């Protein structure tokens, strides 16, 4: 019984790793559309967010939780930066919301400096937009 349980956890870890690598691939592709005949800036960032968030829901106790959450924050931020002006402000606000969620869940993260920089930049944009 214990052996079966351990095997299940081991296989779940492999599935989480696969999901993380898929989300990271989408993130790394960024706004690249390849040979596509239509322009869909940010689509890969959105795919990264969806993939990572699904993995977080499906495997809430994963060791990759922090990495997946950071990937969501980065992807939302980069998507916001590349957004058209009409959507940029809302997407920067989503980035700020994601920052607070990350900071609450991982207050001791080794990525805090990067996360703080994302927050400062997003806040600056939102503040400039409100003036």
Model-derived segments and their meaning:
Residues 1-131:
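Acidic, polar-rich low-complexity tracts and alpha-helical solenoid repeat scaffolds
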């Amino acid at each position: 019984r214990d052996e079966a349980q351990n095997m299940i956890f081991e296989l779940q870890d492999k599935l989480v790793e696969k999901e993380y690598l898929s989300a990271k691939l989408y993130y790394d592709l960024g706004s690249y559309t390849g040979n596509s005949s239509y322009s869909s800036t940010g689509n890969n960032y959105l795919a990264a967010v969806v993939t990572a968030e699904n993995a977080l829901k499906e495997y809430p106790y994963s060791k990759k939780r922090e990495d997946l959450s950071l990937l969501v924050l980065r992807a939302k931020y980069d998507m916001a930066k590349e957004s058209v002006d009409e959507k940029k402000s809302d997407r920067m606000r989503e980035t700020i919301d994601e920052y607070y969620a990350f900071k609450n869940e991982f207050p001791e993260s080794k990525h805090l400096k990067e996360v703080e920089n994302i927050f400062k930049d997003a806040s600056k944009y939102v503040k400039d937009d409100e003036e």
